[in-house]
Amino acid sequence: MQNQTRIVIENVMPQLDCGSNPIKRIVNQKVNVTAAVFSDGHDVIECCVKFKHENDKKWQEVRMKPSVNDEWSAAFKVEKQGFYTYFVEGWVDYALNWQHGTERKIQDNQYVKSELLEGAEYVKSVMELATDSEREYLEKAAAHFTNESEYDQAIQLAVSAELHQI
């Protein structure tokens, strides 16, 4: 199917008259944004609020955090007077889906070598966005994932909280 969207974003708040009128805030006040964000299935999803002042060229981004059910929330600060534009963006996080699926297989004592090779590809794809210390960790993880003699270390890295955070 063409143009198939897997992420649904509804009930973005605050808004007035379905977004036809601007909300009001003063300088240094926070805009608390909530939205219902969900997907068709059990994939791990992530979302963010993108915002910018009317005179800015670049969008700023704040990651949203899940609260109850399918509701997500985040806040950004009004830093200068004027009009701000914001929207919520959501996506399926394939790397986190890989990590959660691999973790379940490891807990079930399954051999996950092919999953580790897949993980090495995910790790390599995010290296350019990583900080120097994160890149060092990712390079170590990718090396372990592709070296069968380091399988035990590789599965520990695959399900690590550090990898999850990156």
Task: Explain the meaning of each model-derived region.
Residues F38-H42, E79-Q81:
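Short solvent-exposed strand-capping/beta-turn motif centered on an Asx-Ser/Thr pair
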Residues P22, K30, N55-A74:
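Beta-rich interaction modules in large eukaryotic scaffold/regulatory proteins
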Residues R25-V31, V159-I166:
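Basic K/R-rich, polyanion-interacting modules in nucleoproteins and related proteins
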Residues V31, I45, G82-Y84:
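Hydrophobic core residues within well-ordered beta-strands of beta-rich domains
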Residues C47-V49:
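Short beta-strand elements bearing conserved aromatic residues within extracellular beta-rich modules
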Residues R63-Q165:
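Extended acidic/polar, glycine-enriched regions
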Residues M1-D40, E103-S133:
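Non-catalytic, glycine-rich low-complexity segments
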